[in-house]
């Protein structure tokens, strides 16, 4: 510790150093020449009053500064809690199933039947279908106008299913004619050998009658149940069942579309709808989708297997047959046990689908009204308008599974009851979004959540007003664009209807042209006949011939039908041009509306786009609004502190350390100063130096003289210093002399060591070196948290700021939870108190202290 000496004078006019004595010094005989004499105990007691005042002033300043900081935190935390509460409410609202959700699905105007069956599409997760699962339906009693040209769901089913199998499978020629003969399969009970015999009267084997069919072109012979083939004109020519009713013939299909477990739906989009007429009180079911359809379910012989215990075992048989050329396809026999099986059409022969992973077989079973069934692997089947050559795997199915569905699936009768209608207008329709309807709500960038979040943010921070304006502007703009888009869609659909009418007229005109060509051919034949019979001098009406007139020679019928068709075609052309022109105008207006620049809205939109890029993966959820609000809040609340800290950091480590050391020195030496001692010393200096004490006093307490140096003393000549030392030594004892310090020499020594710099840098270097380090200790102090303004720990300061924010949020949350619990406890106590008082009141009423009721007495 550096000793500090005060220099003054004695009444004799000789200056003597007034020293601060150590703790062991006693008041000796030389104390009469000193202005005061005391030890540490008396010093502490005398400086107590000033220390208390300093502490009180420091506490007041710290409380004011803390209050200012708390004000920032209170405002910020209030806004943060407001945003969190708003976000929680919006999150809860978005997750609720709304009973009446106003969607973009719309029905308005008149419902007319439409023949545009290509508006019906396949929806589902299967490849080739639209990956969309939203559907709705409800009952209505609206009147609908349908005609014979109204498309049904059955037509679309045949088209879509056939397209799926036609595009997924390989073309086949299995629908050619077969030369078949009836055979019997005879087997002995003792062996697994079966003989194939040609007979006229066939008998059943394994529950079926059998045919041996030969396809000469492919050198292929198949042994097949009679139920799978159809005879042609009571001859030996047979074809697979269903070939005449289908136009697509395929084989080797992917297993995925043969399991019978993959669902799809045939759906439409507004302004088209599907209607199923129930015929009960003129009500109909209207929706955007028809019933669920499973891929792989056959048209005929549908059977449903239910129950846990189902087992099928292969019966291995050796088929003994005559010599043959090419391929001989033998049947695969099964014995199955079905505990619960249903025939959909009450047919004696049923078809079920047995499958495992990557393998499937269609079993044709004989329904014998018992749990034991004889089955054979089916060779052919019909799905939609596709005729399939069903797979026949060589490996038997071990892990057997059976498809389970309702008999109404893929039912032709039910699909034919669903008809396609089209509305002429678009109006909002309340649709239930509960789980039983299957309507799934999609989050939207600019919806109720966006508007509410923008309004809340606008009340919290001024920057969010721009976003709210953008949200409202974009909502109106999008609504206008949607209206124009609906008009474009309606006009386009109307134009397509008109084009369809034109196509029908063109088809009729083509038929008429074909008829005219036939008439010309007939006329040519007549001409040739006239030439043969020698008809001469003929006109277009009369012919002079010797042969009688024959009515079969032909007639030329005049008709005005062609002129009517031409007139209708011209009218339709005009309507199509008008409709398409209106659609083009609406589309242009939609693009103009959507691309109309708005300076404020465009700025906000760009800002929103940048924020969306900064926060990837959040999408259009409510988290985007909350994160945006938190970022803006942190930016506004932390930017002043960040800028202030940056300014202090860039101002240099010297000034930061200097302020830190000043504050530390002030707190360290405040308790050692004494008001009474200082006053006595000032009086002594005033009497000895003739007024120079005031100057010394000002210098001591000046801003640049805080470390105990005296510039007045430094400016005096060194001889004056020596004279003071010489005269002072004669008035102090040896003990006190040993404790006299030389502050000037110490200070000069440090000044010389500082390289001629100003005294402030020297004192800074002195203080840091006395603490045992250099300028890099500032960084250590910053990391330890002992430095108020860190010089190199700015990232650490930011991290601790984030930790403090999280801690304060958690603290406010816990305090809020405590308040809620306290309110709940008070409420429960109030309820219990009310119940107690009511019970007490009732009890007192029923059992009063003094009874005024006199009981009757019987004498």
UniProtKB/Swiss-Prot annotation:
Spans through the membrane: 615-635
Topology, Cytoplasmic side: 636-859
GO biological process, alphabetically ordered: symbiont entry into host cell; virion attachment to host cell
Record topology, Extracellular segments: 7-614
GO MF, one annotated term: structural molecule activity
Chain residue ranges for the region called Fusion peptide: 446-466
Signal peptide: none
A Pfam family it matches: GP41
Record keyword NAD present: no
InterPro entries found in the cross-reference section: GP41-like, Gp90_EIAV
Keywords: Cleavage on pair of basic residues, Coiled coil, Disulfide bond, Glycoprotein, Host cell membrane, Host membrane, Host-virus interaction, Membrane, Transmembrane, Transmembrane helix, Viral attachment to host cell, Viral envelope protein, Virion, Virus entry into host cell
PTM section of the record: Specific enzymatic cleavages in vivo yield mature proteins. Envelope glycoproteins are synthesized as an inactive precursor that is N-glycosylated and processed likely by host cell furin or by a furin-like protease in the Golgi to yield the mature SU and TM proteins. The cleavage site between SU and TM requires the minimal sequence [KR]-X-[KR]-R.
Keyword Cytoplasm found: no
Region (Immunosuppression): 498-513
Residue ranges listed under propeptide: 1-6
Domain of life: Viruses
Sites marked Cleavage: 444-445, 684-685
Gene Ontology CC: host cell plasma membrane; membrane; viral envelope; virion membrane
List of glycosylated residues: 40, 112, 141, 148, 186, 214, 233, 244, 340, 368, 399, 406, 411, 483, 490, 550, 557
Residue ranges of coiled coil: 576-624, 663-699
Subunit structure: The mature envelope protein (Env) consists of a trimer of SU-TM heterodimers attached by noncovalent interactions or by a labile interchain disulfide bond.
Function: The surface protein (SU) attaches the virus to the host cell by binding to its receptor. This interaction triggers the refolding of the transmembrane protein (TM) and is thought to activate its fusogenic potential by unmasking its fusion peptide. Fusion occurs at the host cell plasma membrane.
Name by which UniProt lists this protein: Envelope glycoprotein
Taxonomic source organism: Equine infectious anemia virus (isolate 1369) (EIAV)
